[in-house]
UniProtKB/Swiss-Prot annotation:
It is found in: Endoplasmic reticulum lumen. This is Nucleotide exchange factor SIL1. The gene is SIL1. The keyword Glycoprotein applies. Interacts with HSPA5. It comes from Bos taurus. GO terms for cellular component: endoplasmic reticulum; endoplasmic reticulum lumen. Keywords: Endoplasmic reticulum, Glycoprotein, Protein transport, Signal, Translocation, Transport, Ubl conjugation.
Length: 462
């Protein structure tokens, strides 16, 4: 054992010497190594990297289509994209990749994977811009031709659903059914009304149906053209109150805003006949319809207004208003007077400002001396006393008329103590009602407007 330790002690320097010799040789080799095998050569390294990338790009297959896997293994061709979630394996016998769906996707495909995996590399040099323009032009032309064809087919389908009126008339004639125009219907109704063999009920029914048709301006003028208007006017002379009532009902509808019919009615004596009904003892419903026809005849027809004054129309209306039980008609009469007064005033103002009105029509309005006639015949007092009516709507219309008559009736109103008392009472009443409206959040309510009219009238009369 001492012999072995001595041997190791003597060999130690030799090992150190050999180690130093090996290190020197290694350094010598590094210093004289060929630069071709250097670890860092920037130029050659960059060149080789570029070549490597180009080679990889050439080797990388272009993805042109999406592979749609099933539940069976299928070979995957180069360039096909695999949807996310598919199962892929390498067939060791053939060397091909195979794809199928996972078992949990047995009843549905992975739509999300399809959408994400649908990548197509399109070669932009395949189609030129001119090719795309030509294709688009052909597409539009084809669409227009298709739309035109669709329109023709749709029109043909609609035509098959309907038949010409002449064919329908012929078929109806074979079935003893006649298609009548409005004109033919009105002729038939007038003949029914004018026939001596028709019962009272049949005549009333004919007038009732006729009123529906003459609301249209053209139909009312057609009624005039074949003489039907005069037949209805003559019906105002009937001894049957119902015939008078419904005849006036038809005339009121035909007169409304229809100047041609209004002129023919004046010439046919309609105004006189209506005033007779209003001046004689008749049922309230008959007088109501007669007043309706009179209002339709007078509005916007200054010549008829002149004739109304000449025939004593204001006296007839005054008697009607003062008749007991005619309060409903009294409000309508006051409304008519207000409309006539303001119509004349606005017509004269418009003529001065715009010169649009014909001189003849303006002259007709100037010959309607309505306000002086109202003052002379006591309408200032009559209108003021109607303010005692209990209905708010009636009071509103009376207040409007009092305002329109103020310039003419100011002196009469000043002397009318009953009017002042009534206005004071109404002022207190509507102050309370307006206060309630204000509490409910209505700053400009209905009662507030009535109160303003009363306050304005009282201010003018002080």
């Amino acid at each position: 054992m001492p012999h072995q330790g001595l041997l190791l002690f003597r060999m130690a320097p030799l090992c150190v010497l050999l180690s130093m010799l090996m290190v020197s040789c290694f350094n010598f080799c590094l210093c004289h190594k060929n630069s071709e095998f250097a670890l860092t050569n920037p130029e050659k390294s960059s060149t080789k990297e570029t070549e490597r990338k180009e080679t990889e790009e050439e080797l990388e297959p272009k993805i042109l289509e999406v592979f749609h896997p099933t539940h069976e293994w299928q070979a995957l061709r180069p360039g096909q994209a695999v949807p996310a979630g598919s199962h892929v394996r390498l067939n060791l016998q053939t060397g091909a990749r195979e794809v199928k769906l996972h078992d949990e996707d047995k009843f549905q495909t992975n739509l999300k994977g399809l959408k994400k995996g649908k990548r197509l590399d399109i070669n932009t040099n395949t189609y030129t811009s001119q090719d795309l323009k030509n294709a688009l032009a052909k597409f539009k032309e084809g669409a227009e031709m298709e739309n035109s064809k669709e329109d023709q087919e749709r029109q043909a389908k609609v035509k098959r659903l309907f038949r010409p009126i002449e064919e329908l008339k012929k078929d109806f004639e074979e079935l003893n059914v006649v298609i009548e125009t409005d004109m033919q219907i009105m002729v038939r109704l007038i003949n029914k009304f004018n026939s001596s063999s028709s019962s009272l009920e049949e005549k009333i029914a004919a007038l009732f149906d006729l009123e529906y048709y003459v609301h249209q301006m053209d139909n009312a003028q057609d009624l005039l053209s074949f003489g039907g208007l005069q037949v209805v006017i003559n019906g105002l002379n009937s001894t049957e109150p119902l015939v008078k009532e419904y005849a006036a009902f038809v005339l009121g509808a035909a007169f409304s805003s229809n100047p041609k019919v209004q002129v023919e009615a004046i010439e046919g004596g309609a105004l006189q006949k209506l005033l007779v009904i209003l001046a004689t003892e008749q049922p309230l419903t008959t007088k109501k319809k007669a007043l309706f026809a009179l209002c339709s005849l007078l509005r916007h027809f200054p010549y008829a207004q002149q004739q109304f004054l000449k025939l004593g129309g204001l006296q007839v209306l005054r008697s009607l208003v003062q008749e007991k039980g005619m309060e409903v008609l009294a409000v309508r009469v006051v409304t008519l007077l207000y409309d006539l007064v303001t119509e004349k005033m606005f017509a004269e103002e418009d003529a001065e400002l715009t010169w649009d009105m014909s001189p003849k029509r303006l002259q007709q309005y100037r010959q309607v001396h309505l306000l002086p006639s109202l003052q002379e015949q006591g309408w200032c007092e009559i209108t003021a006393h109607l303010l005692a009516l209990p209905e708010h709507d009636a009071r509103e219309k009376v207040l409007q008329t009092l305002g329109a008559l103020l310039a003419t009736c100011r002196d009469r109103f000043h002397q009318d103590t009953q009017l002042h008392r009534t206005l004071g009472t109404l002022q207190a009443e509507y102050q309370a009602l307006a206060a309630l409206e204000l509490q409910e959040g209505e700053d400009e309510g209905y009662f507030r407007e009535l109160l303003d009219s009363i306050d304005s009238l009282l201010t003018e009369l002080r």
